Design a protein with these regions (language model features):
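Flexible loop/hinge segments at secondary-structure junctions
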Residues: 23-360
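Bacterial N-terminal signal peptides that target proteins for export
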Residues: 1-9
Length: 360
């Protein structure tokens, strides 16, 4: 049998090529828009300061790809180049895309797309979600994912400041508001307001964890009647808005608007809108921690079983950066809008589920 011997330099080149094929880790994160700012900040923080770059195709939606090394946050990766791609689509949609290996748009790094094209596609590896997998439509079995809890995310009802007299929502009122607002519908006086003009309920689309969480927490079942505005600024029926930013803009602009938001979005329009207590309890982190305020859920991180070891390393570095007690307690990106897991004295086992004590 004739054997062909390769020169030493050829063997070396082949070995180098084999190493290069595994010389980078490419991880794509999708899901919750409510947790977007925290994820962007923490993702950037786990890269080595001296070796990191960002391709930002949309700062407002978080369509960003980071690239660099993570030798401090993930020592086992050493000098391996890591590409961490962020593309937020909503909690339920994000989990579905991870489970179904659906291609999503991500920001392309130089050389990854045709000239003049700014985005490329990837199958997402991780999804952030404001809700348990079982709350997706259709429900996703717990066995489909590795899942961990990153934080506690409260939601609040917010009204335009012109809706004077609306100082509380009971559970029954919140449910009625979901189906009876708008033209010819519920007047603000029904909620304690000072006039007979109709009140307009705005909200998120069906893929939104914010919507799912709020509906579960108030016990609403069915299809809500939601409103947005058209180009002329007039109210029109909608299936729901794709982001909290769009919803808060409606509440800010329209004197007869009310809706539900994450705390960060509510704070962004504090000059024009105010929080509405639920069942007589105003939102505060303390009221969440002790179980008095009930409109809240968990922020989850999920991935399909079988994620590669190097991607698990990146996942764990991101998770550690987000759940670090010092970060959750002291960083305003987190502690203004979210409640620290370590501070909770209560828990719940499902979205909108019974709140039980962790202390006794």
């Amino acid at each position: 049998m004739k054997r062909t011997l390769l020169p030493f330099y050829a063997v070396a080149l082949l070995a180098l090529g084999s190493t290069a094929a595994f010389a980078q880790v490419d991880v794509t994160v999708t899901g919750s828009t409510a947790f977007r700012s925290v994820t962007i900040d923490r993702a950037w923080s786990i890269f080595d300061v001296s070796n990191r770059s960002a391709q930002t195709n949309s700062a407002s939606t978080g369509l960003i790809t980071f690239s660099g090394t993570m030798s401090n946050a993930a020592p086992s990766l050493g000098g391996t180049v890591v590409k961490l791609r962020l593309s937020f689509s909503g909690s339920a949609r994000g989990m579905e895309d991870v489970r179904n290996s659906t291609l999503i748009n991500v920001a392309a790094l130089p050389g990854e797309a045709a000239p003049g094209v700014s985005n490329t596609t990837r199958i997402p590896d991780l999804a952030l979600s404001d809700v348990f997998p079982s709350s997706a439509t259709p429900p996703i079995p717990e066995s489909a994912f590795n899942r961990s809890v990153l934080g506690v995310i409260p939601f609040v009802y917010v009204k335009n400041n012109a809706l004077t007299g609306v100082t509380n929502l009971t559970q029954s009122q919140a449910n009625l508001l979901m189906i009876a607002s708008g033209t010819g519908g519920m007047p603000s006086s029904f909620l304690g307001g000072n006039n007979s003009n109709p009140i307009y309920m705005t909200g998120r689309d069906a893929e939104s964890g914010t919507r799912i969480s709020v509906e579960k927490c108030i016990g609403f079942v069915g299809s809500p009647l939601l409103w947005t505005t058209n180009g002329a600024g007039n109210f029109v029926v909608t299936n729901g808005l794709t982001s909290g930013g769009l919803e808060r803009d409606i509440i800010k602009a329209k004197a007869d608007a009310i809706g539900y938001l994450g705390v960060a979005d509510a704070n962004a329009i504090a000059a024009s809108a105010s929080l509405v207590p639920f069942n007589g309890i105003p939102f505060s982190h303390t009221n969440v921690v002790i179980g008095q305020y009930s409109i809240w859920g968990y922020e989850h991180l999920v991935n399909k079983v079988g994620l590669s070891a190097t991607k698990v390393t990146v996942r764990d570095a991101l998770k550690a950066a987000i759940t670090a007690p010092f970060f959750q307690a002291s960083n305003t990106l987190y502690n203004v809008a979210f409640t620290a897991v370590a501070e909770m004295h209560v828990e719940r086992g499902s979205d909108g589920g019974t709140i039980t004590s962790l202390d006794f």
